């Protein structure tokens, strides 16, 4: 089981590297964030099932709820940005500007 956990951790690291490399487009960043959340969900589920901790059995479901909320907010932001600016480049966003 250690090799499965290692592969899932590597998938998380690869998705994190994708966020750092493909940060020019918002859609690419959102896809990499979803990959990170999916690998975290699988890792938490496997760790809970391996350790037989019944008190934390709701944690994967809570993680899925937060992942769905993150996806919804991200897609709403993507639609708003693409209708306002005409593209999804992250360079157009300057959130510190008044």
Curated annotation (Swiss-Prot):
EC identifiers of the protein: 7.1.1.2
Signal peptide interval: none
Spans traversing the lipid bilayer: 1-21, 28-48, 61-81
Pfam families for this protein: Oxidored_q2
Subcellular location: Mitochondrion inner membrane
A molecular function GO annotation: NADH dehydrogenase (ubiquinone) activity
One GO CC term, this protein: mitochondrial inner membrane
Record's subunit section: Core subunit of respiratory chain NADH dehydrogenase (Complex I) which is composed of 45 different subunits.
Family assignment from sequence similarity: Belongs to the complex I subunit 4L family.
Protein's name in the database: NADH-ubiquinone oxidoreductase chain 4L
Phylogenetic classification of the source organism: Eukaryota, Metazoa, Chordata, Craniata, Vertebrata
């Amino acid at each position: 089981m250690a090799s499965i956990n290692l592969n899932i951790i590597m998938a998380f690291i690869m998705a994190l590297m994708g966020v750092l490399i493909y940060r020019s487009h918002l859609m690419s960043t959102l896809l990499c964030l979803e990959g990170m959340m999916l690998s975290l969900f699988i890792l938490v589920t496997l760790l809970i099932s391996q350790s037989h901790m019944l008190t934390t059995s709701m944690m994967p479901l809570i993680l899925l709820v937060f992942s769905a909320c993150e996806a919804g907010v991200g897609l709403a932001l993507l639609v708003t940005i693409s209708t306002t600016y005409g593209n999804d480049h992250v360079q157009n966003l300057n959130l510190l500007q008044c």
